Amino acid sequence: MADLSYDKIEVGTEYGPWKYPLKERIARHLEAVENAHPWHHQRSPWGPPVAPPSILGNAALRFLDSIAPVPPGTLHAKHEIETAAALRLDRQPAGYGRFADKYEKRGRRWFVFETRWRDETGLIIGKSIVTMAFPSEQRTVNSDQEGRSQKSEIRERNGEMTPIVRALTQEKLTAYSEDSANALRGLSIHVQPEAAKKAGFETTVAQGLMSADYISEMMTSLLGKEWFENAKLSLASLRPVLSGETLTANGRLAESAPEGAVVRRTYEVWCENALGEAVTAGTATALVRPD
């Protein structure tokens, strides 16, 4: 199958339904991000165990792989994940996708891929929107510059949550990305060190969505069921994270506003490396019951 290309993307074209192999992948996914929350392994408030809401992000990338693999080194710039209902592990999720946009900006070519998800009963689970940039020689430079521009701002924030700390070993990176089209053909910058070095990195690079999983786990501990229903995670990737680094997820309440019978809470959330540099930052919002 030929790689995805900017010229061949047809904005608005619909794809799907495509079935994500949840039952086959969930154990490796949870292992990759070290998520031991009991709702994902034992009974949950919905009965059977459920998947982390953030899994819709990785499912969207595999859906994209089924259309055409992204060229190695494609930049994962932004990701939004909206949840409407919990995804039970005993049910089959199906995605419906489309290329929502493509454009040229700052000398690079970008595209936006949107997916909507239901389970086998027709229950709407949520949606995922990923923004990516095709490779260019300026990729690493731009990522570093964006990270430096956010560094001081993130340092000034005081995290108010119970942080999630994770060491990104190669074993974890492989477990997370081993089923990608590029990994299966030996071209993944997340799995194969040779591919990462060819792309200009010292070693393998963590998939940016791993930060989303850490933040989602943190929000699950904070909000419980309310993080699985009517919630949204919006994140930007600010700088690459290499194998061997340690990340810390944290956040703080930014706004709480009444919305009918419930309250909409907005949290500033981020992941930092050991130097205190932000690698991922954005917002998490959820509708919660009043205190």
Predicted regions and their residues:
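Hot-dog-fold acyl-thioester-processing enzymes
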Residues: 1-78, 139-229
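A conserved acidic, glycine/proline-rich C-terminal tail/linker
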Residues: 230-234
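HotDog/MaoC-like acyl-thioester-processing domains
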Residues: 2-14, 78, 83-165, 237, ...
